[in-house]
From Swiss-Prot:
Role summary: Translation factor that promotes translation elongation and termination, particularly upon ribosome stalling at specific amino acid sequence contexts. Binds between the exit (E) and peptidyl (P) site of the ribosome and promotes rescue of stalled ribosome: specifically required for efficient translation of polyproline-containing peptides as well as other motifs that stall the ribosome. Acts as a ribosome quality control (RQC) cofactor by joining the RQC complex to facilitate peptidyl transfer during CAT tailing step.
KW Electron transport (keyword) present: no
Signal peptide: none
Organism, scientific name: Manihot esculenta (Cassava)
The protein, known as: Eukaryotic translation initiation factor 5A
Gene3D superfamilies from the UniProt entry: 2.30.30.30, Nucleic acid-binding proteins
Keyword annotations: Hypusine, Initiation factor, Protein biosynthesis
SUPFAM superfamilies, per the entry: Nucleic acid-binding proteins, Translation proteins SH3-like domain
Family indicated by similarity: Belongs to the eIF-5A family.
Matching PANTHER family: TRANSLATION INITIATION FACTOR 5A FAMILY MEMBER
One Gene Ontology term from the biological process aspect of the record: positive regulation of translational termination
Keyword Transmembrane helix: no
Basic and acidic residues bias spans: 1-12
Residues bearing PTM Hypusine: K52
Length: 160
């Protein structure tokens, strides 16, 4: 055994699964589901009765949490669906670069520089205007299935 120290900086999620299985019949409105390989928030669920040939079916209508597109899927209620691990994290906004990336302060005091400004015009203008006015802004970043996007903004007062 050597006395050397080994330092690892984790940039990956250690191969953890981006989704978990859940029975279709137990997924409810406002939950999450993967439809056509996209993480979606469930807006509507309707269940059809068991037919002559087989299972009751669940009809899901979801909105992609990153691009806002409406997606639909029909799954037998006894089958498993993929449900994305969705995380929401708040970061303080430090800077906006000219190429459209933001610089964010993490809880540990490090910076996160790999996120683009949001494409939503309303949110984009709120962030740019608030930053230009020198306000202290906190952005919420939603992450699921290897994607991250700024989804909301909080003003925590003027900078001192």
């Amino acid at each position: 055994m050597s006395d050397e120290e080994h330092h690892f900086e984790s940039k990956a999620d250690a191969g953890a699964s981006k989704t978990f299985p859940q029975q279709a019949g137990t997924i409810r409105k406002n939950g999450y589901i993967v439809i056509k390989n996209r993480p979606c928030k469930v807006m509507e669920v309707s269940t059809s009765k068991t037919g002559k040939h087989g299972h009751a079916k669940c009809h899901f209508v979801g909105i992609d949490i990153f691009n806002g597109k409406k997606l639909e899927d029909i799954v037998p209620s006894s089958h498993n669906c993929d449900v994305p691990h969705v995380n929401r994290t708040d970061y303080q906004l430090i800077d906006i670069s000219e190429d459209g990336f933001v610089s964010l302060l993490t809880e540990t005091g490090n910076t996160k520089d790999d996120l683009r400004l949001p494409t939503d015009e309303n949110l984009l203008s709120q962030i740019k205007d608030g930053f230009a006015e020198g306000k202290d802004l906190v952005v919420s970043v939603m992450s699921a299935m290897g994607e991250e996007r700024i989804c909301s903004l909080k003003d925590i007062g003027p900078k001192n």
